[in-house]
Design a protein with these regions (language model features):
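Conserved, single-site charged/polar hotspot
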Residues: 2-424
Length: 424
């Protein structure tokens, strides 16, 4: 799981049904007992353009009753919009001539031809697309419903990237971890009508376009396999680069309860060498002058403290006051001319940002400050790693694969005490 990210959503969402190509795949044979996953592609959008391509018409059904709503001719475009008469509780489909259908709580784009895929926002997806009104605080919700193995084929590549043949074990490990995470969190957004977001709030999912033979190979070779602890599917966190050691879950998340399988694990294999030292974010450095630091804190500190009408007070110091058991920042103290504020470790990356739109790479860092007249004029952070550091270190997994470790060993190392089980 990557760190949560709140993203601005566009007001218009494009949905097309397009003709698929043989690669990356004619529709795969479903695994027996394979669960379905509902993935939110967009939430709260104000219109969705629906259309068939030049090869054939698009069939649309009522999402609740299954009854036919209409057939969109090849090349035509209909638009789904919230129904004003029901204050957005339902939606209508507007035809090219301006006439509209009766209100529906939701509609489904039916995929009726083999090797064709539902398309939304110019991306192709397996399964079917549902457009639903009246959820998630208004607007329309666009959901892709598909088997979890097909979902994983669109997740593994974006999450761990294309890898060399000698790194395949890392891809297999990613497939297992991503499946475990998805199944362990299925139903988390039940009130919103889906199971997962298609971005870093859960896992990055980009559909058919990012499927590769390598991703499908990893998914098929690990089909149905998940990690369990004492018979229960685990919380399968993962991150880019631990930097030297993974972290306990309670170190990274304010509400994180201790779990025996989510504890610090060293990534060192020799003096001064680490499995993840091949990562471009293995070591990093950030610097702020007084003006930049003030601008950043003016934007980020209101989340944890009030700022008076006169603005932020001059900053006299920024210091680490507590470290965690894995050696990360457990608490950060920001000192002003009159008073201070203490930031818990889980919030540090969002408060001490390198840029307003970019969080700090990790909480594994040391600070050096320069002062003039008692005021902080320059702050430097020298750090290690990228991400929350809990669970599987992706670059560490790649390094371990290069060293000859198979995916079972990689998984048992990063999730000690767990078992690798096939559940369907």
């Amino acid at each position: 799981m990557r760190p949560s990210a709140t993203r601005a959503l566009a007001n218009t969402f494009l949905a097309l049904l397009g003709l698929g190509c043989p690669h990356p795949g004619a529709a795969p044979t479903p695994t027996a007992g394979e669960p379905e996953l509902r993935v939110a592609l967009a939430v709260g959008v104000q219109s969705v353009v629906l259309g068939g391509n030049e090869s054939g018409e698009l069939f649309v059904t009522d999402d609740g009753t299954g009854q036919a709503v209409g057939s969109i001719p090849a090349g035509a475009r209909w638009i789904a919009i919230p129904d004003s008469a029901t204050q957005g509780a339902k939606l209508r489909l507007v035809r090219p001539d301006g006439t509209a259908t009766e209100p529906h709580t939701g509609i489904a784009l039916v995929n009726v031809t083999e090797n064709r895929f539902a398309m939304t926002n110019a991306r192709r997806y397996r399964g079917r697309i549902n457009v639903v009104a009246g959820r998630a605080g208004g607007g329309l919700t666009v959901v892709n419903r598909l088997g979890i193995e097909s979902y994983l084929a669109g997740v593994v590549g974006p999450e761990i990237g294309g890898r060399r043949p000698d790194e395949l074990a890392a891809v297999l490990a990613q497939a297992v971890v991503s499946r475990t995470f998805a199944l362990g969190n299925r139903g988390r957004y039940e009130s919103l009508g889906f199971d997962a977001y298609a971005d870093t709030r859960d896992q990055v999912y980009n559909g058919v376009a990012v499927e590769t033979p390598q991703a499908w190979d990893a998914v098929r070779r690990t089909a149905g396999q998940v990690l369990r602890y004492r018979g229960e599917i685990i919380d399968a966190f993962f991150h880019s680069t631990c930097g030297f050691s993974t972290a306990g879950v309670e170190e990274a998340f304010a509400t994180g309860r201790t779990r025996p399988y989510l504890r610090p694990v060293s990534d060192q294999y020799a003096k001064g060498r680490y499995y993840c030292d091949i990562s471009p974010r293995f070591r990093w450095r950030e610097e702020w002058d007084a003006q930049k630091l003030r601008a950043i804190f003016t934007r980020t500190l209101p989340a944890v403290m009030p700022i008076g009408g006169d603005g932020l007070q001059p900053i006299t110091d920024v210091e680490v006051t507590r470290t965690t058991r894995s050696g990360r920042v457990g608490e950060l103290r920001i000192v002003f001319e009159h008073g201070d504020v203490r930031i818990p470790g889980g919030a540090v990356r969002s408060i001490l940002r390198p840029e307003v739109d970019r969080t700090l790479s990790s909480t594994a860092f040391q600070l050096t400050g320069t002062k003039d007249g008692g005021r902080l004029t320059r702050l430097v952070a020298a750090g290690a790693g990228s991400g929350h550091a809990v669970g599987m270190c992706q670059w560490g997994a790649v390094g371990r694969a290069r060293a000859g470790q198979d995916h079972r060993r990689i998984l048992s190392t990063y999730f000690p005490g767990t078992t690798l089980d096939r559940i369907y």
